[in-house]
Amino acid sequence: MLDLSRAWGGVLTRATPLPDVWAGLAAKEIKFRRGQVCMVAAAPNAGKSMFALVYAIKADVPTLFFSADTDTTTVMMRAAAHVSGHSQISVENNLANDSHYYDSRFEKLGHIKWVFDSSPSIDDLELEIRAYVELYGQAPELIVIDNLMNVTAETDNEWAGLRAIMMELHDMARKTEACVLVLHHVSEQSEYGSPINPPHRRAIHGKVSQLPALILTLGYDPSQGTLKVAAVKNRFGPHTADASNYAQLLVNYAACQIGDEDQFGRMLRRDTMAGYQGGYNV
């Protein structure tokens, strides 16, 4: 055991924030921090996987991305669309004609290493992290788990399994001093209001909200090209459990672009509303 000052002296990251990539989130004091478990929860098709992908690309920190819920082809097309500004349809056509079409663009993704096991166990996650440390001499600063439901539990009880996994991820964040960003589902949206608005904290599936330091819920309005991001739990900043206080980002998911409420973001929103799918200088 240690006294508090000595324990504090041995902590390297001290909940160090990862880079802000959207001013709208920074204005709400929403920050992903090292040594902490953070959660992004949303209904299906709200864009949580794309949100995590774009954040990981733009944050530009050493990242280990467990893409269990999203397959290699989908990630490839989304990543290529984001770094090129092309629509995902254009990416698919370009790759069909030349599988190396986007190789030069993927230099922007060199900080991310991928694992595409569709149902990893906690032991599998730990083995991959150890392999990363052995290869690069340090742990990643960001570990993304997409998503919690895909991680294999050691019990047949779903809720007990989810809670046990979250406890392991909490321990993982402490030991690696990485930000562990876990994606998760919410319960049926009809119980908690409109699907275009972020769900309440109580909507999180499995009631696993105790351990994360930060929980964001997402509400996506495809007709308006808006993504609302609410901090329903935030140990280091303001939050509202009912998701009534949120940041708004502007998006064009067809081109895997997420922006602030600035000139570029407003263009994304206009294009989404007009059905235009891509062709951006990024």
Region locations from a protein language model:
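A short alpha/beta connector and helix-capping loop motif
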Residues: D156-H170, C179-V180, T226
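C-terminal regions of RecA-like/P-loop NTPase motor modules
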Residues: M1-S5, G9-A15, A23, P44, ...
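Short, well-ordered alpha-helix to beta-strand connector turns
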Residues: G35, A59-D60, L109-G110, P212-A213
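Structural recognition of the conserved hydrophobic beta-strand(s) that form the central parallel beta-sheet
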Residues: V144-I145, A178-H185
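The Walker A/P-loop phosphate-binding site
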Residues: M1-H86, A274-V282
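Conserved inter-motif catalytic segment of the P-loop NTP-binding fold
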Residues: T63-D156, Y276-V282
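Cofactor-binding loop segments of dinucleotide-utilizing enzymes, especially the Rossmann-like FAD-
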Residues: A68, H185, Y220
